Design a protein with these regions (language model features):
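Conserved RNA-binding domains used in RNP assembly and mRNA/RNA metabolism
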Residues: 1-168
Length: 168
């Protein structure tokens, strides 16, 4: 059975149904070379023009962001982490959110992991040069597309605590 998925490439948003296995979405996507969308709609980022297709194969590397809805993965595999509030730029996108890493690793360690897509929680997603932003609980960012990463706090936050308030 398929599930809805929204992903963002450099020039469009892709919305459709994908066939994925059980487990965390990030694990599933990181194992694929091509993501196949069924009943897909592509919306151009520049003018909003939409095109619908029955089936669309997208090379995983072309995707910049993937929205995560509902999938939290196996609770048994979770481990204690600290959060780092960071702003990343990838393609036309600017994302501010929390990266998670084990307490004993270096800052921004999540961006040097083996996984192509890494999760960012409490994310605010926008495009460079545009004012509109969207908030998402979790997005997966393609770390190979990141051109800049800027920490927003010098001190990481224990993930068991709520994130610090953002300055106005």
């Amino acid at each position: 059975m398929g599930e809805p998925l929204v992903a963002w490439a450099g020039d469009c948003m892709v919305r459709g149904v994908v066939e994925l296995g059980d487990g965390r979405l990030s694990d599933q996507v990181n194992e694929l070379d091509v993501v196949t969308f069924y009943a897909a709609t592509l919306r151009a980022l520049d003018d909003g023009h939409e095109v619908a297709v029955d089936e669309l194969d997208v090379d995983r590397g072309e995707l910049h962001l993937i929205e995560v809805q509902g999938r939290r993965g196996d609770p048994v595999r979770r481990r204690r982490t600290v959060q780092e509030r960071v702003t990343v730029e990838l393609g036309p996108f600017v994302v501010t959110g929390n990266l998670h890493r084990p307490p004993s690793t270096q800052p921004l360690a999540a961006l040097s992991s083996w996984a192509r897509f890494v999760p960012m929680t409490d994310a605010i997603v926008g495009q460079r040069g545009r004012e509109d932003r969207v908030s998402r609980d979790v997005v997966l960012v393609n770390r190979e597309r990141i051109s800049k990463a800027v920490p927003q706090s010098a001190v990481p936050v224990d993930s068991n605590q709520p994130p610090p308030a953002q300055p106005a």
